[in-house]
Amino acid sequence: MTVEITLEKSIIKYGEDIIVLIKRIDSSDEPLSLTIHDESDDSIYAIGVSGDKNIDRVVIPSIDIEQWDCGKYFLRIFGSKYSSSFELIN
């Protein structure tokens, strides 16, 4: 499975949504799991992504991240070697 993960912004402020663009390179129609990990590599958030499109736009609402600490976070698709990262700031 080849999937590209692109973030609309690499620096996210509290109160902003996280917008993720997921592009399937191999046209797989399998559902995906998008996970977010903190700096200690603990998985802190997961969301399922449908398998019916080559390009998906996923919005993680700001309310879901209000309790997270400032710092760097990593996005991964389960089973893919590619990842992306962002920094959460005040």
Predicted features by range, described:
Residues 52-59, 69-76, 80:
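A glycine-anchored, Pro-Gly-centered beta-turn/N-cap motif
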Residues 1-19:
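Short, compositionally biased P/S/T/A/G/V-rich stretches that sit at domain boundaries
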Residues 47, 82-90:
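Edge beta-strands of extracellular beta-sandwich domains
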Residues 18-27:
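Aromatic/hydrophobic beta-strand junction motif of beta-rich domains
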Residues 40-56:
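Solvent-exposed serine/threonine-rich low-complexity stretches and specific carbohydrate-binding patches
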Residues 28-32:
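Short beta-strand/loop motifs in extracellular/secreted proteins, especially
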